[in-house]
């Protein structure tokens, strides 16, 4: 038996989950928030109860030391020698990393070298990696990349129709994200369907505040909706998804905003928030539609119809589909979004049961038994995928 800790470091946060492997039992999980800001918050769950402490945590290294102290203080582990491996979520692996990788000084430098591809995320991920390396230098650590799963996409999927030298010189191409989640739910779908993954054509819909759709054929990603950055694809909580690129100079001219300001609007003030005018939270939007709010209704329809279009396009791309999977916060919990996305897909063999769809947050088939295309809800588990990769690579 081994104990593996899965880490997701943000710019001012650190999420953690400790697993007993290979049973995949979760021993504890928690979150450090507001790192480097006054009144940092440390939350850890012990025997199902949440313990919260407000204190000053100036940087990630202090957060890591506090986390490790709490593991022993609460008796979750006897001492730090019990930790056999650390898995770090890293958002962007570029073209360099098509699989998770054991972290060495060399691989850390390579991750730093591609940080410009994900300036909001990778630097924070690296801070987390270095903080653990400082405190537990001899424990094997693994980086698990959001982009790695999509490195199987063929050229016709990942190339933009731009001058080819942009790709050669600057690495401008589609990378795709949420790969760890898409990989988990498609592997789990094969288990639930009782069929080999290599024989399946699957469409995975990871719908959270960020959302992406993936076409997975024979267990390999062949296309996905996000692009060079996580801004592309479907409309999201605050992100615009795909727009006409010529809009950017047009908006700059009309509003007097700089390019960075327009980009900030596309990333943080668009999507559900932009259209509804009041919230990026889908639950608020759904409630408002029940009260007759027309802008909320429009926001919900835009969100669902973009997903609906990707499903149709990916089914065409794979010459059919065996199952459609809904996952992540919205995909797992929003009865209304699933209903709107699936409406009208009967022409391609999708027959779903409204009664079965009335489920939240648990594994379920929501299609009729006779439906040629199965529709499934599979709660994602990116952390367990990280732990599995640590076990696989740190042997």
UniProtKB/Swiss-Prot annotation:
Q: Per the record, what are the reactions this protein catalyses?
A: acetate + ATP = acetyl phosphate + ADP
State the pathway, as annotated in the record. Metabolic intermediate biosynthesis; acetyl-CoA biosynthesis; acetyl-CoA from acetate: step 1/2
One GO BP annotation here?
acetyl-CoA biosynthetic process
- Cited InterPro entries: Ac/propionate_kinase, Aliphatic_acid_kin_short-chain, Aliphatic_acid_kinase_CS, ATPase_NBD
Report the EC code(s) recorded for this entry. Answer: 2.7.2.1
Keyword Chloroplast set for record: no
Q: What is its main location?
A: cytoplasm
CDD domains referenced in this protein's UniProt entry, alphabetically: ASKHA_NBD_AcK_PK
Residues marked Transition state stabilizer (site): 178, 239
Binding-site positions, substrate = 89
Q: Which family does it belong to?
A: Belongs to the acetokinase family.
The protein's matches in HAMAP family, at most eight in alphabetical order, are given as: Acetate_kinase
Question: What does the function comment of this entry state?
Answer: Catalyzes the formation of acetyl phosphate from acetate and ATP. Can also catalyze the reverse reaction. Appears to favor the formation of acetate. Involved in the secretion of excess carbohydrate.
Q: What is this protein called?
A: Acetate kinase
